[in-house]
Amino acid sequence: MEALNSMRDNAPRLGTSATAESITSKHTPHAFSNSHDSRVGDERIVVLGGVPLRGEVEVSGSKNSSLPILAASLLASKGQCILHNVPHIADVGTMCEMLQALGASVQREGHTVIIDAENLQSHSAPTELVRKMRASFYVAAPLLARLHRAEVPLPGGCVLGPRPVNYHIDAFQKMGAVTTVERGAMNAVAEHWHGASIYLEPKNSSVGATVNIMMAACLATGTTTIENAAREPEVVNLAEYLKKMGGKIRGAGTATITIQGVKELHGTEHTIYNDRIEAGTYLTAAGITGGDVTVHGLPPVHLSVYIDKLQEAGIEITHGDRWIRAATVQPLRATDVATAPFPGFATDLQAPFLTMMCLAEGRSAIEENVFDVRFNYAAELLRMGADITLTENTAIVRGVSKLSGAEVQATDLRAGAALVLAGLGAEGRTEVTKVEYIDRGYEHFVDKLRSLDGQVVRQTKSGNKK
């Protein structure tokens, strides 16, 4: 308790006496390395609940924008790619290690990453890196487009059920690649790399397939059209980057994207969008704890459907051009949601929202339509006193008057964050293990929660503070 109170009292206030930049000012230029690796499995987040979160927080750069944009830097055959607002998270570290393993030079200064891929050499992605995260498969398209050959193991990352890369491979085949999948890896050769008309299944509008096809098509002969393309802001951010590199792309942000191939792409300078999922997480934390939180750096249009659902749940929302405030002024109301591709309810915010519904009055139905397995964390919430029943792809949540602290285990990135939020809204002490999942996508998660008065500390297994 003393350690938690001490950390809370000394925490910086984002938006008042400190900013996100001041937290990371200790970083100096260096070749990129993944500093989280040595800590994997050795730490936990300890939470004392019952304190409403209040204050302001700066949203970091987007994980889901950073990863494809970093991979797309391999397409530049001359000049440096300078990327700003890149978050300090484990998945970015893994992707930068991947680029280095393939022959690119990668340097970092604060939130800026500089990539020089002129001497791209290897067409073979290291298995140990690809299996760390699904987004590693994004390097397949740049390798095929530049080297006309790619050997990429099938990806890993969070366990969210089967997420095959068949859409990606089918598109590569239509563009002229000869592919095989053997011993857990895709091998592809593309002697004649050309544009194609590609139709994606409308149910999912795969973001991963959309961005891989966009990258692949930039250096293909002729025109490529993607029907039922993903419309996420992260797709738009990538398209903006590719166009700065010399690519010819129309329609990003709509269901039909057209790419006219060019002979080469060059380095450029670009800024990563801020993270809408991180913003939604902190807004939800206000509801779970009965608090009042303002997030800065995100246009509300990136969260419009989620904002509507927060309001339906009884949270008061106000916003400006690049800020959103969530204030809890009345008891939470049960609210039904169904996840869907953008502009629908984001699957990455399903776990935080379900956690909030555990404390709402009434019965909620949370329907998961994007991933087959994304309720594994529900068993952990049951340990805290939640009332949840799972039926196929739907969780029925009956609100309870309180949650109780317990030792729980993160099952994936977003579930890990949601369990920390559950601890903040619970009575007593909660310990969250497997926090390496959270490191994959949230920059300075504990520091930011502490800046909002959250009683949170990160510890090693021996109890030492980090």
Q: Each predicted region: which residue ranges?
A:
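Short, structured segments at the rim of ligand-binding sites
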Residues: 2-466
